[in-house]
Design a protein with these regions (language model features):
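ATP-dependent carboxylate-amine ligase
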Residues: 1-139
Length: 139
């Protein structure tokens, strides 16, 4: 299978720090970014325009975009210089996970940058797949 690494990105400061961390990767990066605008995330998603996605655009092997506001995020990546035709956009967390599983070679890893509720949605789907456990369960 593939390895998934989740790094919470809920504001420009955190997202930019995550992106700088990704620059330490030697290989090209399979990146998935999810943006929700639910109450726990904050309704205003204009902060995505303050994130320096341009830092990693040239380092991406693939880009998958999801969440309730996936199309806003796709537009932001378009303006960062990433070609729209090369993005895979799916609002569905399950659809995003299925795409990653089918498009990334076994043994490779994907980095996932979700907002808070998108992380909860992803963990719920991963739990249903048997790939992780619920937060409150002991390992």
């Amino acid at each position: 299978g593939i390895e998934l690494f989740m790094m919470l990105a809920k504001n420009p400061a955190g997202a930019n720090q995550n992106l700088r961390t990704l620059l330490l990767e030697e290989e090209k990066i399979h990146l998935a970014v999810l943006l929700n605008d639910r109450t726990a995330d904050g309704k205003d998603v204009s902060w995505i325009w303050d994130v320096d996605y341009e830092l990693v655009v040239d380092r991406l092997a693939s880009l998958t975009i999801g969440g309730d506001r996936a199309y806003d995020l796709a537009l932001r990546f378009h303006y960062s210089g990433f070609p729209i035709a090369s993005m895979h956009v799916t609002p569905s967390p399950l659809g995003l996970l299925e795409h990653l599983k089918s498009s990334i070679k076994a043994g490779e890893k994907a980095i996932i940058l979700p907002t808070y509720t998108a992380m909860l949605d992803l963990r719920s789907e991963l739990n249903k797949m048997g790939a992780t456990h619920s937060f409150w369960e002991e390992q």
